[in-house]
């Protein structure tokens, strides 16, 4: 086990540590503001840089279709049978944004094949620790077997991990480990970096890759986003998109039963 040394410590910041300073503006109307992002690999434009999380309590076909109608993206969660997930993907009406999550072990190859058969064009390799050899092998398999799929992978917490996933072939990287509302990775394992610091670290590597003429995946801020201000801070820090879970949970578009007391 690696031992901690003084040089291993560094200051990190979370959303609550930062406030943006108001600046002079020549924007007459908020309607003039353009937050859209063009996803080259999907040949589609997202009017809003927001993705609904592939959580069992957040995204199934209803949420995915709603996100698409609002200009965002929804990723169908993987915590169901292959046949049921396949059915959910088939219910997505926008053929440009059929997205779902898979794991990296077990039935993931069989699952992915079944999803591609019903028009999947975006896959999220969904694991707690994205900087891992199994993720590397999964990305290698997906890129070689389904080269036209838009590939999201993660989660990672450092610029070096972002760089590795870039080299492995990810098109987008989910950034932050263990800071979501129900994610306990940071607490249970003692590992993680606050989302804002993770974004900044990854963005610095992204700039370096672009300066060197290399492909640089989209950065997806994922975890600990509690309000619209956190979304703004994420984008200001260098994220291209944000992934929301708790902010969307409990809405009528989410799966689950309504309980009344």
Q: Across the structure, where does each feature detected by a protein language model lie?
A:
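Alpha/beta enzyme core
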Residues: 2-7, 12, 18, 59-260
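An N-cap/entry alpha-helix motif that binds or orients negatively charged groups
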Residues: 1-50
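N-terminal cofactor/phosphate-binding cores enriched in small/glycine residues
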Residues: 32-39, 43, 47-78
